[in-house]
């Protein structure tokens, strides 16, 4: 009986861990090339399971692009030494990370009806250049690509 119970416990653990790995994988993102975006913070939400930065970037074509950038959870922000108010509206930051394989448009509604609610392209942050100019790792899924030659700079005309 104990052997059967033990096998069932192992089986349940293996089956349930797949969804956790899927949630924390970069399968949705194109990790073959890192992308860099520079813009102004519109909103920052330090929430679980992932923080969200709403960023506006002025392109070389003069158009403003909106980005929804996924970052670390609140406990990881704390481990990195950041307070929940580390980013404020108006801060200029640069982010390096990965775009989704498919175009994802989505909206996060703020409970405060007077707050801005933005729709933007989802972007997974790996490296940030903070308002004070310091670089900070925000991920561990290939940050080396943010320094590698050939990364895609969103400011470069296509």
In which residue ranges do the predicted regions lie?
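PEST-like low-complexity, intrinsically disordered acidic/proline/serine-rich tracts
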Residues: 27-158
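Bacterial N-terminal signal peptides that target proteins for export
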Residues: 1-10
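Boundary at the C-terminal end of the N-terminal hydrophobic targeting segment
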Residues: 20-22, 27
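Bacterial N-terminal signal peptides
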Residues: 9-19
């Amino acid at each position: 009986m104990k052997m059967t119970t033990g096998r069932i416990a192992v089986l349940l653990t293996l089956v349930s861990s797949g969804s956790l790995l899927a949630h924390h994988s970069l399968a949705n993102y194109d990790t073959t090339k890192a992308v860099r975006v520079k813009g102004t913070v519109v909103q920052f939400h330090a929430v679980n399971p992932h923080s969200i930065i709403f960023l506006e970037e002025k392109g070389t074509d003069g158009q403003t692009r909106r980005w929804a950038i996924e970052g670390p959870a609140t406990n990881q922000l704390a481990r990195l030494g950041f307070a929940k108010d580390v980013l404020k509206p108006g801060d200029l930051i640069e982010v390096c990370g990965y775009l989704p394989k498919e175009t994802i448009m989505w909206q996060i509604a703020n409970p405060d009806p007077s707050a801005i609610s933005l729709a933007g392209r989802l972007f997974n942050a790996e490296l940030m250049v903070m308002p004070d100019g310091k670089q900070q790792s925000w991920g561990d899924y290939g940050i080396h690509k943010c320094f590698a030659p050939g990364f895609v700079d969103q400011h470069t005309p296509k």
